[in-house]
């Protein structure tokens, strides 16, 4: 009976967390459109955290920085280093974009582990990290694609499209396909890792509620940070590639 009870609890946990993805959604009806309310609510919370942190960081800057100012300056330097490494000397205008991507994904990922989303009851579905929803990760990947094309066109004009027939026109279909697979790989990598992390925690909490999930949660925090870094690094690399014009 204990085994059956554990199995039922595990299946219930898996059903609850997967409910965010398989149709148990909370929608807002605005005119003739259905708006995905779950993602908007959690995204607004993440944005509020970022804006609040930014306002604290710039409220009273000191010539001799204190601990909090040092922390935010370190984050800025880190983002600048990532951008410069991947984009090159023309990285400056892209630091805000890469930084926004990195910080939004990082805070979104960590919010899934640290914020008690599931305590908030909704008529349908449940709240979870914004990056736990494929809609969010696809939107972020499409933004990266727009930035990728904008960087290339602003640098080279219509001559940017000549890269599709280099080094030979035979590679035209492959080069076009590559630009479609980039946002797909970005979105599914981020979505899959975050969803898998939460599923593992749910299974372990159902089986061993007290001890085992704790180190797994710490591992999840670490991998969540790594996923944010990977996404931002690849976004910067794609932008740098489009400006340089080589693969």
From Swiss-Prot:
| Primary subcellular site in the record, as a coarse category | plastid
Give the top-rank taxon of the lineage listed in the UniProt record for this protein.
Eukaryota
Keyword flag Chloroplast: yes
- Name the UniProt key words of this record, in alphabetical order: ATP synthesis, CF(0), Chloroplast, Hydrogen ion transport, Ion transport, Membrane, Plastid, Thylakoid, Transmembrane, Transmembrane helix, Transport
The Gene Ontology terms for molecular function here are: proton-transporting ATP synthase activity, rotational mechanism
Specify whether Amino-acid biosynthesis is a keyword of the entry: no
The record's listing under Gene3D superfamilies reads:
ATP synthase, F0 complex, subunit A
GO cellular component, alphabetical, reads:
chloroplast thylakoid membrane; plasma membrane; proton-transporting ATP synthase complex
Q: Which parts pass through the membrane?
A: 38-58, 95-115, 134-154, 199-219, 220-240
State the membrane topology: Multi-pass membrane protein
Protein localization: Plastid, Chloroplast thylakoid membrane
NCBIfam families hit by this protein = ATP_synt_6_or_A
- Indicate the family of this protein: Belongs to the ATPase A chain family.
- What function is annotated for this protein? Key component of the proton channel; it plays a direct role in the translocation of protons across the membrane.
Subunit: F-type ATPases have 2 components, CF(1) - the catalytic core - and CF(0) - the membrane proton channel. CF(1) has five subunits: alpha(3), beta(3), gamma(1), delta(1), epsilon(1). CF(0) has four main subunits: a, b, b' and c.
Q: What is the name listed in the Swiss-Prot or TrEMBL entry for this protein? A: ATP synthase subunit a, chloroplastic
Species name: Oenothera argillicola (Appalachian evening primrose)
């Amino acid at each position: 009976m204990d085994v059956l009870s554990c199995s039922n609890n595990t299946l219930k946990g898996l059903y609850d967390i997967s409910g965010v993805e398989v149709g148990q959604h909370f929608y807002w009806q605005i005119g003739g459109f259905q708006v995905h309310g779950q993602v908007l609510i959690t995204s607004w919370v993440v944005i509020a955290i970022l804006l609040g942190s930014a306002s604290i960081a710039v409220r009273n800057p000191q010539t001799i920085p204190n601990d909090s100012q040092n922390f935010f300056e370190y984050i800025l330097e880190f983002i600048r280093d990532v951008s410069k490494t991947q984009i090159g000397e023309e990285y400056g205008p892209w630091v805000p974009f890469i930084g926004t991507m990195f910080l939004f994904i990082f805070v979104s990922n960590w919010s899934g582990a640290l914020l008690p989303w599931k305590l908030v009851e909704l008529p349908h579905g449940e709240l979870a990290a914004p990056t736990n929803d494929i809609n969010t990760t696809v939107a972020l990947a499409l933004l990266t694609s727009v930035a990728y094309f904008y960087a290339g066109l602003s640098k080279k004009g219509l001559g940017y499209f000549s890269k599709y027939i280099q080094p030979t026109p035979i590679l035209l279909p492959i080069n076009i396909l590559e630009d479609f697979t980039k946002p797909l790989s970005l979105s599914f990598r981020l979505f899959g890792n975050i969803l898998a992390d939460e599923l593992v925690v749910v299974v372990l909490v159902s089986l061993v509620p007290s001890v085992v999930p704790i180190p797994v949660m710490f591992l999840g925090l670490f991998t969540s940070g790594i996923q944010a870094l990977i996404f931002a690094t690849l976004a910067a690399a794609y932008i740098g590639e489009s400006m340089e014009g080589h693969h």
